[in-house]
């Protein structure tokens, strides 16, 4: 890309006692990756979810910086495999961390290609004249929808939407999804936790992202939108303009 600018913000929301969302936003190289964006939404009692998301972000950066692998998918797959194993060990060693885990959605732009890795239900979008979800939710309701056993937006959907089927640190192995998308310029990249997407319609998100305001203003407006609509969860947002 000729230029890439990004802004990030996380907020506790209006109802949660602690913020279990973590993020990392770098337009500068991280190891062999020319840039790196990550959002993680932790789960677990006490401070376990907070620890899981923060540790995952921190350790992913460390492992990516040290990686001797060459292609983005290999770098990311090996890093998250190691992080998953380390988190499992920590949960076995410390009962306060039992049951912890975290979602992870991650993006990097290499030349004119977007690489996305996803585990759980935090999301990555590409936005221009339309809003396009790149990542795929690993959730109980999405599996039922895929089998034709549930309708998106139904009462049952909202009751069970937060049950995720994949997470970092929750199972002995972790299976991320990878997506590779060509870029043409003029797109906006959005990574966020469900604290935004559960509180805001896609079109309202797209309108803010494409409003023409400066990056910091638009990023803050997305967080404000989630809080204005109830702020029932922590909110993490990374917004990047791809030119």
Predicted features along the sequence, with ranges:
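PP2C/PPM-type serine/threonine phosphatase catalytic domain
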Residues: 1-243
